Curated annotation (Swiss-Prot):
Part of a translational control module, also containing pths/DDX47 and ais/DDX52, which coordinates germline stem cell differentiation with ribosome biogenesis during oogenesis. This module allows for coregulation of ribosomal proteins and non1/GTPBP4, a p53 repressor, preventing p53 stabilization, cell cycle arrest and loss of stem cell differentiation. Its EC number is 3.6.4.13. This is ATP-dependent RNA helicase DHX33. Keywords: ATP-binding, Helicase, Hydrolase, Nucleotide-binding, Nucleus, Ribosome biogenesis, RNA-binding.
Amino acid sequence: MDSKYFATSRNDAVGPSPVKFSFKRKYDAMANSPILEKKPHVAQIKQTIAPILLTSKRTSIEQQQKSLPVFNCRHRILKELEANDTVLIMSETGSGKTTQIPQFLLLAGYAKNGMIGITQPRRVAAITVARRVAQELNGTIGDTVGYTVRFEDVTSRATKIRFLTDGVLLRESIKDRLLLKYSVIILDEAHERTVNADLLFGIVKDAQKERRKQKLANLKVVVTSATMDIDHFGNYFNCKGMYLEGRTYPVRVMHTKEEHEDYIHTVLVTLFHIHRTTPKNHDVLIFLTGQEEIESLAQQIRQLAKIDTTGTTDLRVFTLYAQLSQGKQLECFVPTPANVRKVILATNIAETSITIPGIRCVIDCGFVKEKSFNTVDGLDVLKSVRISKAQAWQRAGRAGRDADGTCYRAYTKAEMDSFADATQPEILRTNPTSMVLQLLALDIDCNNFDFLDPPLEDGLRSAYKSLDALGAIKTGDDSYITPLGRQMVQYPLDPKYSKLLLTASSFGCMEEILSLVSVLSSDHVFVSNSEKNEMAALAHAKFQSKHGDHLTLLNVFNGFLKSEKPKMWCHDNYLNLRSLTYARNVRRQLREISEHLHLALNSSDDIEMLKKCILNGFFENIAVLQRDGFYITASGNIRSKIHPSSVLHGKYKPSYILFTEIVQTEQTFLRQVTEISIEWIKEVVPFVKNIPTR
C-alpha cells in the first residue's frame, strides 16, 4: 500500500479518508506499493468474537468443540457455578463461550428445573447462535434449542436452551419478576451496555434475592464478555471473575497517514487494492454506519466490479444490518466458491457475538451511528460519531479469527489517539423514557433501582415529564403507572407508538395506525438505484401523498398488502421486499396484542382524523416554519430542515409539521414529516405549550 497513504501501527485510530486525485491513480499507486507493517498479536485486542463456525468436510463438530479454548475450562466453569450463584467470565476472542457454556450447563443437568436463557443484544446474534447450538446438539431449531426475538418465537415445550434478546427477557420480567421459568440466565456481551442489559443486571440480582427470601430454587447467573471492567462488575454483583484464554491470530494494523473527508472513497480504494493483491479466499469485512450507506456502497462496488478490466468479476457483495430479513442476514455465513471473494458490508452488528468464517481483511470506517438524547428538548438525535478504542480493536480482531489477517483503518493514528477508551453505556446517552415505563410497570421507582451506572437526573426528569404528558404515568411525590401505561407496556414499542395504537380506535382508524406503526418499525422501504434513478423516482411518485411521508408510507404498505405477487411488485416499484415483509409480520403481532386488549379494530379513510391521531402520539415532535425557511422544533428550539428524502422536500413548505426523528449530518434534518395545523394542535393536544411563533 502506498506509504504516503497508509501507515502501520500496533494501536488504533479513527477518521475518514478520501483523496483529491482520481480513483484509478490512487488505486494503481496502492496496488504497486509495498506494505510495511508490524504484527501485534490479537490477544492484545479486547473484543468478543463468539465461535460461530461452519462445519467443514474435514473437521467434525465434535472436533471443533474440543479445539475451542473453553472446552478445557468446562470443569472449572461448572465448579465455580456450583459454588456461587453469580459468575463473571471474561474470555478472549474465539474462546467458545457463547455456544459452549449453555451446552456444558445442559449436560450438567441445569435444565432439569428450568430453561437456560442466554441474552444477546441483537436479534441476528440470538438467531445465528441458536441455530449453531442446535446443529451441534444434532437437533432441530425450536426443539431442545430455540430462540425468541421481537415479533418471532421459535421455541416449544421441549426447549431447554433459549437464546433471546435482552429486550425480550426484560419484557418477560414484567409478568414474572422472579424469572421462574429459568434455572440459569447467561447475560452475554455484557460490555455492550445496552439500556435493556443494564436493567437486566438489576432485575436478575433482585430475582436472586427474592428467590432466596422465598426459599425457592436458586437462580444462577453467568455474565460473559471480552472487554468488561471486571472490577466494576465484580463489585456490583459481589463476586469474583474468572478469565479464560482465547484463540487468536496475528493481525497487522494499518492507518491512513493523512486525514481525509470522505471515508467512503478510502474504503473503495482499499477494497479494490485488496482484491487485486491478495488471494481470493481472503474475504473482506467492511464496517460502515447504516443501511443507506451500506446499500449505496454495495451498488458502487458491484458497478466497479463490472466495468473493471482487471478480473474483478470474481467478487460477491453481501450486506449485514439489523433491518435485513433473517434469510438475508444468514447469507453472509455461506461460503462462496473457491475463486470468488466474499465482501461483507456491515454495521457494528458484526463487532461482537457473530463470527463470519473466512474474514482475513477488515476495513474500518471509524464511525458508528448512534442515537443521543438531548435532555433539554427531550428529543432523540441520530448521528454518526467516532467509535471508541475498544470498538476499534474489536473490529480489527475480526480479521484474526481463522488465520493471520490485516485491518485497514480509514483514519490516522493521531485521530485514534483522541478516541474514548470505551463506548459510553447507552443508559448515559439515550432516551430513558421506555426504561422508566418498564420499571414502573414492575412497580420499581427509578430512584430505588440498583443500577450498575445510574442514568442522568436530567434525563429521568425529562422521561417522567414525557410519560406524564402521554398519560402513561401520574407524577407527584410518588409517581405511579396508570392503567393506560400498563396497556402501553404490552406493546414492544416506543411509548409514542404504543400511545398511537391505544388511542387510534377513538379516532376511528385503528387498522391504518397498525399499518403505519408497523412500517415505521421496519424503516427504509424505498430502494435507491443509481443506474435507474429516474425510473425509481417515477415508481415512487405514484405512492406520494401531498400530506407528507406518513401517509406516503401507508400508501406503500397498503399496496404491498394487496399485491398478489409481492416479490415482483416490490421489484417493479423499487421497494424493499425485506423491510415490507418484516412490517407485515410486525403488523400481524401488533394486531394480536390489540385484540387481546379488546381494542376496536376500526378503519377510516378520513385523512384529517388519521393525521390528528398521529399528532396525538407525536405531539413532542412538532416543528414550525420560520421566515428564513428553517423549521424550529417546539421542544428545544432546534433549527432544522426537512430531510431530502421527504416527499415535502423542495416543494410547498407547510407552516406546521410533525416528524418521526431528527437526523444530524453536516446539517440537522427532520425525517418523515407530515403537515398539521395550529388549530389541530389546540384541539388535539391543548396541553402542548411554547409553540414557536412564525
